[in-house]
Regions:
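N-terminal "arm"/small-domain region of PLP-dependent enzymes with the aminotransferase-like
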Residues: 11-73, 206
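Conserved N-terminal alpha-helix of the aminotransferase class I/II PLP-enzyme fold
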Residues: 64-111
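Short, glycine/polar-rich helix-capping loops at beta-to-alpha or helix-loop-helix junctions
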Residues: 134-143, 364
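Active-site phosphate-binding strand-loop segment of PLP-dependent enzymes
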Residues: 52, 154-210
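Conserved PLP-binding catalytic core of the aspartate aminotransferase-like
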Residues: 296, 301-308, 315-349, 360, ...
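PLP-dependent enzyme catalytic core of the Aspartate aminotransferase-like
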Residues: 60, 64-68, 72, 95, ...
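Active-site C-terminal subdomain of aminotransferase-like
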Residues: 204-207, 214, 219-325
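Conserved PLP-anchoring active-site segment centered on the Schiff-base-forming lysine
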Residues: 119-138
Length: 391
């Protein structure tokens, strides 16, 4: 039966968000994810808000691989991994991921959110310490909440090496310290100070975990991620990432680590023990996406070139764009309603850029987030800059 207090609360929230201009629009897309998409009731618009960083979501080889996976294995596994849900294509994908990012082994998940929810409760011991950057992704935060209550959790200010070292010094009596960071921070677009983090973890015998979801396929000459960008392949203990961004854009996530760590995750990680395995069509698509990158690393170079061009173009228009090699360019607005207003203005001009406010970012720090793709042509980039010039 309906609950009147619940109904009243829901209606009040919706009314407040609507009146304050904080309601987020949901656009219905009627075409594949590519630079120009068809929006229901609008027509064709230029997308500058997609995670399709390398333009592989509609790559012919990636699509054909997914179709083959669907034909060969059907719609899904209908089982968790340890019962009858492990397909040979899962093993092929996991071997491909481990080889690509440079670890002993890897395990796939239906999302990187699931991967981070599996990682911390499974591998972190009850007397361990987690040291987490304050701007880490929500999936890391939620994964940490699922750990033993006895685990000590401390948050250090964003990229503050001084505070992190102090925390490492203060927690040396604990069995294992885990330093956890995004490789690329999704709302700031900046890169973790990985060389210094590696040095600190070696100095204090701590484990280093990097969520490279917005870096894999983006950073490094081969698109391997943050560790390749800094020439630190093999120096990160645990890497988590997604298959739903640069690596085909479909879905899925992974943990890449030592063979022992992966075996423990297989045996005890709850997300893969209690939910179906990744569909074969996604495994095939992701495998092919990695092959495309390996066979043609110039696609990564095109992304880097597009990022530099758009970032400079926005700076020339007077927008405050912090220098960064990543494909994420935040434009700070402050007021959430104003950010959403500017997003709608851009949409009316045929360019899709999303305004982000609370709870995705802190109150008072609303922003537009531009996301760049290797698939953008010079004409697309000029169209985008022309629209921003009219704001």
């Amino acid at each position: 039966m309906p609950n009147s207090q619940f109904d009243t609360r829901c209606r009040g929230l919706i009314t407040d968000w609507t009146d304050s201009g904080q309601m987020k629009p949901f656009y219905n897309i009627e075409s594949p994810m590519r630079p120009m998409v068809e929006i229901s009731g609008k027509g064709e618009v230029l997308v500058l808000c997609s995670n399709n960083y390398l333009g592989l979501a509609d790559h012919p080889e990636v699509i054909e691989a997914g179709v083959k996976g669907l034909r060969d294995y059907g719609a899904g596994t209908a089982s968790v991994r340890f019962i009858c849900g492990t397909l040979d294509c899962h093993r092929s994908l996991e071997s491909k991921i481990a080889s690509f990012v440079g670890t002993e082994s890897a395990l796939s998940y239906v999302s990187c959110w699931n991967a981070n929810e599996a990682l911390f409760p499974t591998l972190v011991g009850p007397e361990d310490v987690i040291l987490s950057d304050e701007l880490n992704h929500a999936s890391i935060i939620d994964g940490m909440r699922l750990m033993f209550k006895s685990v000590t959790k401390k948050v250090y200010k964003h990229s503050s090496l001084e505070q992190l070292e102090t925390l490492l010094q203060e927690t040396q009596s604990h069995p294992t310290r885990w330093v956890v960071t995004d490789g690329v921070f999704s709302m700031e677009g900046d890169v973790a100070k990985l060389p210094e983090l590696v040095d600190l973890c070696k100095k204090y015998d701590a484990m280093l975990v990097v969520d490279d979801s917005h870096a894999v396929g983006v950073l490094g000459t081969g698109g391997k991620g943050t560790h390749e960008h800094f020439d630190l392949l093999g120096e990160v203990d645990v890497i988590t990432g997604t298959l739903g961004k640069a690596l085909g854009g479909a879905a899925g996530g992974y943990i890449a680590a030592s063979a022992d760590a992966i075996q423990i995750l297989e045996q005890r990680g709850r997300p893969s023990l209690f939910s179906n395995a990744l569909p074969a069509t996604v495994a095939y698509s992701a495998c092919k996406a990695i092959e495309v990158i390996e066979n043609d690393p110039s696609i990564v170079a095109r992304l880097h070139s597009n990022v530099a061009t758009i970032r400079q173009g926005l700076a020339d228009l007077g927008f405050d764009c912090t220098p960064s090699p990543t494909a994420i360019i935040p434009i700070m607005i402050g007021d959430e309603a104003e950010a959403i207003k500017k997003s709608k203005q851009l949409f009316d001009l045929g360019v899709m850029v999303i305004g982000f406010g609370f709870p995705v970012v802190p109150k008072g720090e609303a922003r537009l987030r531009v996301q760049v793709s290797a698939a953008l042509t010079d004409a697309h980039i000029q169209q985008a800059l022309d629209a921003f010039a009219k704001l």
